[in-house]
Amino acid sequence: MASIFKIHSAYKPAGDQIKAIENIADSFQKGAEKVTLVGVTGSGKTFTMAQVIQNLGLPTLVLSHNKTLAAQLFREFKEFFPENAVEYFVSYYDYYQPEAYVPSSDTFIEKDSSINEEIDKLRLRATSSLLEREDVVIVSSVSCIYGLGSPEEYTNSVVALKTGDTIERDAVIRKLLHIQYNRNDIDFSRGNFRVRGDSIEIYPAYHTDGIRIEFFGDEIDSISRINPITAQTILKLEKTYIYPAKHFITSGPKVKVAIENIKAELEAQALFFRKNDKLLEAERIISRTNYDMEMLQEMGYCNGIENYSRHLTGRKAGERPACLIDYFQGEFLLIVDESHVTIPQIGGMFAGDKARKQTLVDFGFRLPSALDNRPLNFEEFETLTPKTLYVSATPADYEMEKSSKVVEQIIRPTGLLDPIVEVRSTKNQIEDLLVEIRKRIDVGERILITTLTKKMSEDLTDYYKEIGLQVAYLHSEVETLDRVAIIRDLRKGIYDVLIGINLLREGLDIPEVSLVAILDADKEGFLRNYKSLIQTVGRAARNVNGTAILYADKITDSMAKAIDETKRRRKIQEDHNLKFGITPLTIRKEVNDIIEREEKKRTSEDLVLEDVEKKFNSKKFPNKEVLKDKLREEMMKAAKELDFERAAILRDKMLSIQINDPSTEN
């Protein structure tokens, strides 16, 4: 029987991929629930995953431990499965400060957040795809275990419209309002609809095209997909389904019942506080909850509404919330990428969330039912995901013990060997590393540097910038889509060096990187243990000149183990290449945006700076003085041509170089 998935790739399975794909698919087809793939960096684990998905023909959830790697996997699976639905589901917050209370200083911190509209659209598209079709691959972060609206309520709220249906225009408007669309006849943007005479134009929250519904009396005369900017028809449709604009949908009757239940819980909690002489807490919970209930009655919404989700969805005390996993209908496959990191992360989410909320409950800021607005605990997660493939270069004991089959993938299809590992003294490590960096830059290769602290990363970035290197610092405060852009710019050569702490280990796929430098490699701990070292060294495994330099004054047990394992794998790979006459080749991959996003309008400043970057890339000049002279020359030329805006931007660029270099005279 033909698979519902179809891979598009110029490559065929090679190296250890052939046996790995066969063994994994065969194990699952024979009833195995847990399988582990131990695959070295650059061995094509993602391609193996795609082949397994195609062979099994099951809807698939791919779980990654951070947004950057999830975005990279999303791009790769989209390229493998262009005819299928490949979706992206991560937290839509650019910034998130959860509600919290600090008893020691009597400080209450209000919830504060900033939502990324593009990611919100992708999340909604993911759930709509799961309801529409079976050939779906969703790449997700740990966000998939957090509470989401009930799939039953979500499905029941879908507005189905068909040409020839008899329905009043106003009835369609009411349905759209119920599923959280806003009527706005002026601003036709995502999640809004407008009414123009006998037609309604809807901009679905999960799509880039609009939908026009035209009526003739009380009958739907035509349905069209339209360009949301020009309103021109793209395609005539026989029918359409409008999915809710938000995941949390609750009907009016349910809200009334929920309010009654919340008031009953409030009464019991206030009585509990009074019995324990906690009068302040009693007054606090009464005033806060009553205010929320007034807002809910009048507006159908209140700040922190998620804290009442148990009542709004009709769950029992302690019952788990619905999450993305519940939207998978029937049998599906879970792939846990970099499982040695992702599995512990899943286990830690529940405990961290409960600790914060318990304090809010104890001091009267929230009702006890707020504790049920939570991520899944680990046991619930295991129960929901019976068919699981763990993927890692360094799987933990948990995965190995749970798996009925462990498959190794050491031989790379490209014949590439594991990197050469060198250990060097920390004495003059920055200058020594600079020499190695310049060697790589001269031949168009890239460099990753990993440090132990944020301050060291920042200082090193500043130092290398001052001496003219094109360097970027990747850290946790950089927004999700901007991290993706930095990695793309490294591949394109806008940057030569990328510096980070914990973001340069698992999964980053950058074939141009030929050198990985690990500073303070002998400082045993989370970032310098065996698994971390293996993962970090592996970042150079996609380049034929791959080298890892470990700066250390002693060889720790973790270093020795990592070096020995790298040598073991390298020997197996060398023997294989010798036997079959294979010449190693650097992986060649196109440089694309990992996540396609709507093009933002660029300002004239953006365009000028881009031009400056191309013309006056600092690495082309022997020193900063020459670079400044060139910028000054260009500035005077722009002023002479009366292009004062360009001249001002060039002046600012020139001054910024002076500011960064105090030793330079004006």
Swiss-Prot record:
Query: What Pfam families does the record tag this protein with?
Result: Helicase_C, ResIII, UVR, UvrB, UvrB_inter
Query: Which residues are in the Helicase C-terminal domain?
Result: 429-591
InterPro entries from the UniProt entry: Helicase/UvrB_N (IPR006935), Helicase_ATP-bd (IPR014001), Helicase_C-like (IPR001650), P-loop_NTPase (IPR027417), UVR_dom (IPR001943), UVR_dom_sf (IPR036876), UvrB (IPR004807), UvrB_inter (IPR041471)
Question: Which GO terms of the cellular component aspect does the record hold?
Answer: cytoplasm; excinuclease repair complex
Arranged from A to Z, the UniProt key words for this protein are:
ATP-binding, Cytoplasm, DNA damage, DNA excision, DNA repair, Excision nuclease, Helicase, Hydrolase, Nucleotide-binding, SOS response
Q: Report the Gene3D superfamilies cross-referenced here.
A: P-loop containing nucleotide triphosphate hydrolases (3.40.50.300), UVR domain (4.10.860.10)
Q: Which GO terms describe its molecular function?
A: ATP binding; ATP hydrolysis activity; DNA binding; excinuclease ABC activity; helicase activity
Could you tell me the Gene Ontology terms of the biological process aspect for this record? nucleotide-excision repair; SOS response
List locations, semicolon-separated.
Cytoplasm
Assembly and interaction partners: Forms a heterotetramer with UvrA during the search for lesions. Interacts with UvrC in an incision complex.
**What does it do?**
The UvrABC repair system catalyzes the recognition and processing of DNA lesions. A damage recognition complex composed of 2 UvrA and 2 UvrB subunits scans DNA for abnormalities. Upon binding of the UvrA(2)B(2) complex to a putative damaged site, the DNA wraps around one UvrB monomer. DNA wrap is dependent on ATP binding by UvrB and probably causes local melting of the DNA helix, facilitating insertion of UvrB beta-hairpin between the DNA strands. Then UvrB probes one DNA strand for the presence of a lesion.
**Similarity comment text for this entry:** Belongs to the UvrB family.
Q: What name does UniProt use for this protein?
A: UvrABC system protein B
Q: Which organism is it from?
A: Leptospira borgpetersenii serovar Hardjo-bovis (strain JB197)
What lineage is on file? Bacteria, Pseudomonadati, Spirochaetota, Spirochaetia, Leptospirales
